[in-house]
Amino acid sequence: MNERIALYEGKAKIVYASESPDELVLHFKDDTSAFDGEKVEQLAHKGEINNAFNAFIMEYLQGEGVPTHFIRRLNARESLVRRLEMIPVECVVRNRAAGSLSKRLGIEEGRVLEPPTLEFFLKNDALHDPMINTSHIRTFGWATAEEVEAMRRWTMRVNMLLSALFAKANLILVDFKLEFGRFDGELYLGDEFSPDGCRLWDALSLEKMDKDRFRRGLGGVVEAYAEVARRLGVPLPAAS
């Protein structure tokens, strides 16, 4: 295509139509935001790192039997994915207390959560992504009972797989969010998995290696993302 059609632009990605009606192109931006868009910066090469990181994780999960929308990486900043009918729910797994959970429940940051917690949030920027429960999801028609159970099952499976993967790289997977969608009547993992959407700590120092570095003004965001990628063996573009 000579001129692409942008279907949606979010905080960190642009979604383009592709030559196939069943496929989309994800373009990873350098934009970084926090606090519902109140804090926004451009961090050079972040989009390239996240694209490579996401491709690595999605391919790993597919190899372990997790159905994802990922098809292939197209270039340094873009990937081709299946066009899903997205379910407007974020599935958040927490292995340690941090972020909003610590604030909401007064739990000390870093406390190990056993078993891990699973929370659901409605994807709605205007409402600031409120927490919801499975009853809300079914009552308001966001997903069926069967889909909710499948999202729960796949999310906990991903947690087991990625916690082990990151542990081998001397990293703690503190928490993360997943989104799912439908394609031909089947449920697939959608969106992305990158340090933008999870918390990762160094296993020894507990240094934050994720977007919290941006939220808290710690600096070195791109460097931390690149270090996480390096430990996992993610091949990065030369400029990164």
Curated annotation (Swiss-Prot):
User: What are the disulfide bonds?
Assistant: none
Gene3D superfamilies named in the record:
ATP-grasp fold, B domain, Phosphorylase Kinase, domain 1
Matching entries from PROSITE patterns are given as: SAICAR_SYNTHETASE_1 (PS01057), SAICAR_SYNTHETASE_2 (PS01058)
Pathway, per record: Purine metabolism; IMP biosynthesis via de novo pathway; 5-amino-1-(5-phospho-D-ribosyl)imidazole-4-carboxamide from 5-amino-1-(5-phospho-D-ribosyl)imidazole-4-carboxylate: step 1/2
Coiled-coil segments:
none
The EC designation for this entry is 6.3.2.6
Q: Which domain of life is it from?
A: Bacteria
Q: Which InterPro entries match?
A: SAICAR_synt/ADE2_N, SAICAR_synt_PurC, SAICAR_synth, SAICAR_synthetase, SAICAR_synthetase_CS
Recorded catalytic reaction(s): these are: 5-amino-1-(5-phospho-D-ribosyl)imidazole-4-carboxylate + L-aspartate + ATP = (2S)-2-[5-amino-1-(5-phospho-beta-D-ribosyl)imidazole-4-carboxamido]succinate + ADP + phosphate + 2 H(+)
| Gene Ontology BP terms | 'de novo' IMP biosynthetic process; cobalamin biosynthetic process
- One Pfam family recorded for the sequence: SAICAR_synt
What Gene Ontology terms describe what this protein does at the molecular function level? Answer: ATP binding; phosphoribosylaminoimidazolesuccinocarboxamide synthase activity
For this record, an example GO cellular component is: cytosol
Annotated keywords = ATP-binding, Ligase, Nucleotide-binding, Purine biosynthesis
Signal peptide coordinates:
none
Residue intervals passing through the bilayer = none
Which NCBIfam families does the UniProt record give? purC (TIGR00081)
PANTHER family of this UniProt entry? MULTIFUNCTIONAL PROTEIN ADE2, SI:DKEY-6E2.2
Family, per entry: Belongs to the SAICAR synthetase family.
- The entry's protein name is Phosphoribosylaminoimidazole-succinocarboxamide synthase
Source organism of the structure: Acidithiobacillus ferrooxidans (strain ATCC 23270 / DSM 14882 / CIP 104768 / NCIMB 8455)
